[in-house]
Amino acid sequence: MNRPYAKLTITKKGERAARSGHPWVYGEEVTHVEGTYQTGDIVDVYSDKDRYLGTGFANDISKIRVRIVSRNANDRFDEAFWQRRVKYALDYRKTVMGDKDFACCRLIFGDADDMPGLTVDRYNDVLVAQTLCYGMDQVKPVIFKALVDELAAMGVTIRGIYERNDVKVRKLDGMEEYKGWYEANFLPQPGSVLTTIDENGILYDVDVENGQKTGFFLDQKYNRLAVAKIAVGKHVLDCFTHTGAFALNAAKGGAASVTAVDISQEAVDMTNENIRRNGLEAIVTAKQANVFDLLTDLAEHKCHDYDFIILDPPAFTKSGHTVRNAMRGYKEINLKAMKLLPRGGYLATCSCSHFMRDDLFRQMLHDAAKDAGVRLRQIEGRQQSPDHPILWNVPETNYLKFYLFQVV
């Protein structure tokens, strides 16, 4: 087969992963290189039996040598190819999210959309993008133009694309850190970095420049509705509230009172603004505190003011090497929460790290309940919303765990 790309031959272990559908080829799996390439170039991947396995972006700087983007040897990686990818991603979101939720959702989710390292979130008329793969960074002008054009065809006008490339992991792929509005002749002057969204009937201010991740945690959209359903008449403690999304959904669902806690004063200020915007000052109170210290203090004072506790911490581990330490952190907060809740109380608990596998998270909860002397009655076990699709052959796309329990 006469191919225009450099050819990388990989080990049997790498071949098994590639044939199973995993898009990553690690540097130690490459045994032979035929031809030359530069970082960001398209290369072919072959087995040691000379079987074609896929084509993707190469990067000798990264631990991941190749990120496969196609397994069709007939594909041409021109503008039309990426336009098809974008259209496919948008059509999927339009179908699974519906018209209303499509206005505020994740449009592109990296490997789950065969666009490795690329995240694009939509907040009404603003898109927020993050590029963590050198090759995708090179083709982003085509991707961004396709997004604006396809959304326009759906009747959506985009006023700006904000790049949140201010993350250290970009350096691992040989790219600089920065953030700011993407400039292109197909985009108008973007205006403010603040925008307002409506999720589940609740209004939020989103700061795309300074907010965590891309400005808002879209993946918990439907898990918040599960909390709202249980919150009726409850006294709720929402830990790690960020901008107050779980707290506000609980209040909107009929909670008697909600206390929202975060260690960041900036997050508390944003939560207070969202409380006022939704007219929920009589129900929700936001306070700045370290959740670990707060739970300890409540336990020492034998406080039983809350019959519903929500734990949505940041990722305690971003590496497989620190999972054991992370489990101790997760167990500590869950154990304390279980001890604080009365019999018949409710606990919503989450982990957003894919390194914290579901079986490990469940085992941690089992151990915490045992040590707390309680039993857990599971109401729901959920994952991220479907705009963050899970590919079963790419376990890294399955990262969010959400469990809702009654303590009995």
Where are these regions (language model features)?
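Conserved class I S-adenosyl-L-methionine
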Residues: 233-242
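Mobile active-site "lid"/loop adjacent to the S-adenosyl-L-methionine
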Residues: 306-336
